From Swiss-Prot:
The lineage of its organism: Eukaryota, Metazoa, Chordata, Craniata, Vertebrata. This is Spermatogenic leucine zipper protein 1. Residues 166-177 are annotated as: Helix-loop-helix motif. InterPro entries: Spz1. Interacts with PPP1CC isoform gamma-2. Residues 1-25 are annotated as: Disordered. Keywords: Coiled coil, Cytoplasm, DNA-binding, Nucleus, Phosphoprotein, Transcription, Transcription regulation.
Length: 430
């Protein structure tokens, strides 16, 4: 009866103990394995304490049971070896997956940083070089236009004076006596000419005053623009330096995490090797099976703690990656705003030659003083429009800075919450 019961137990044990490649499957209860080892450790010599049976059938059954126990022990050893092999495969797969994810994230962030550095260098080098010759050309054109207008007015008045002088000479030579009243008329005309000359001189003085005022306003505008550009450049440079420092710190932290990951992987591998050596020595000697389950439990706890640490590190790296993505988006917005400013400046420079040509056409038609005043007012309004556009662009930059500050505060809040949750879970496990 005992032999039949033990033979019935054999297939049930082999069915339940065979492991599957599922990494989430639960292992055997260590109490069962300890009981089996205790049963197998008893030698047949201990059975001598039982009363001696004379029948040969009892001796045959005892030999069969001993053989079955030996077979059970062999199967248990094979099962333990298979379990160790599956644990090694699971740990290797986890290590490969984590290493590939970390390296891909670090390489992608490095490429983004390099692209942004190149864009900043291109903008800082191309903007001042492209705008300097256009300013010089516009100043030269305005000076030439003013000089041509003044010379044309002076030449026209000189021609009128010469014509009147010739008429006076002809009259004085041909009709000195008979045309006394005409002399009086000529004197009146000369007086009118003198008055015209005086009015021309006043017009020239007024034109010079306008030119001087325009030049002073140009100088003031240029100084203001240069100061604003210098301030913007300093702000951009400071922000880029801060971003670079943050990026370098994050890269250093990523390298530190990768080093810790490699050290942990080395420790796990060394532990697995030591476990293999222990299992081999125990398999060869067949002694000391009781201490192995306790060691396995402690090793499992250590591995679980290490896996939790690695998951915490990966979560922190993901948060850092989110922060980097937010900063990259802010930099892209900055670049777009700078491009818009550059396009606006180009548009104003294209509008200025059109206004200059319009002024030339009006001056060819000999404009009056009232028209000159109107042109001066129009130039004032145009300059006010350009300053309004610049103020608007500066406000957009301030909005970007506020968005950046809000994003950083939100990310810091999320990171603190995550760290508190991890610390609480770790303390509860301890």
């Amino acid at each position: 009866m005992a032999s039949s019961a033990k033979s019935a137990e054999m297939p049930t044990i082999s069915k339940t103990v065979n492991p599957t490649p599922d990494p989430h499957q639960e292992y055997l209860d260590p109490r069962i394995t300890i009981a089996l080892f205790e049963i197998g450790s008893h030698s047949p010599s201990s059975w001598g304490s039982l009363p001696f049976l004379k029948n040969s059938s009892h001796q045959v059954t005892e030999q069969q049971t001993a053989q079955k126990f030996n077979n059970l022990l062999k199967e248990i050893k094979d099962i333990l070896k298979n379990m160790a092999g599956f644990e090694e495969k699971i740990t290797e797969a986890k290590e490969l997956f984590e290493e590939t994810n970390i390296t891909e994230d670090v390489s992608a962030h490095k490429e983004n940083i390099r692209g942004l550095d190149k864009i900043n260098e291109m903008l800082s080098t191309n903007l001042p070089v492209s705008l300097a010759p256009e300013k010089e050309d516009n100043e030269k054109k305005q000076e030439m236009i003013l000089e041509t207008n003044i010379t044309e007015d002076v030449s026209a008045h000189k021609e009128n004076i010469r014509g009147l002088d010739k008429i006076n000479e002809m009259l004085s030579t041909n009709l000195p006596v008979s045309l006394a009243p005409e002399k009086e008329d000529n004197e009146k005309k000369q007086q009118m000419i003198m008055e015209n000359q005086n009015s021309e001189n006043t017009a020239q003085v007024f034109a010079r005053d306008l030119v001087n005022r325009l030049e002073e306003k140009k100088v003031l505008n240029e100084t203001q623009q240069s100061q604003e550009k210098a301030k913007n450049r300093l702000n951009v440079q400071e922000e880029t330096m801060k971003i670079r420092n943050n990026m370098e710190q994050l890269l250093q932290e990523a390298e530190h995490w990768s080093k810790q990951h490699t050290e942990l992987s080395k420790l796990i591998k060394s532990y697995q090797k030591s476990q293999k050596d222990i299992s081999e020595t125990l398999g060869n000697n067949g002694v000391g099976f009781q201490t192995q389950p306790n060691n396995e439990v402690s090793a499992k706890h250590e591995l679980e703690e290490q896996v939790k640490k690695l998951s915490h590190d990966t979560y922190s790296l993901q948060l850092m990656a989110a922060l980097l993505e937010n900063e990259c988006q802010i930099l892209q917005q900055r670049v777009e705003i700078l491009k818009e400013l550059h396009h606006q400046k180009q548009g104003t420079l294209q509008e200025k030659p059109i206004q200059i040509n319009y002024k030339q056409d009006k001056k060819n038609q000999k404009p009056s003083e009232a028209k000159k005043v109107e042109m001066y007012k129009q130039n004032k309004q145009a300059m006010k429009g350009t300053f309004w556009k610049k103020d608007r662009s500066c406000r957009s930059l301030d909005v970007c800075l506020n968005k950046k500050a809000c994003n950083t505060q939100f990310n810091i809040h999320v990171a603190r919450k995550a760290l508190r949750g991890k610390m609480r879970s770790a303390s509860s496990l301890r």
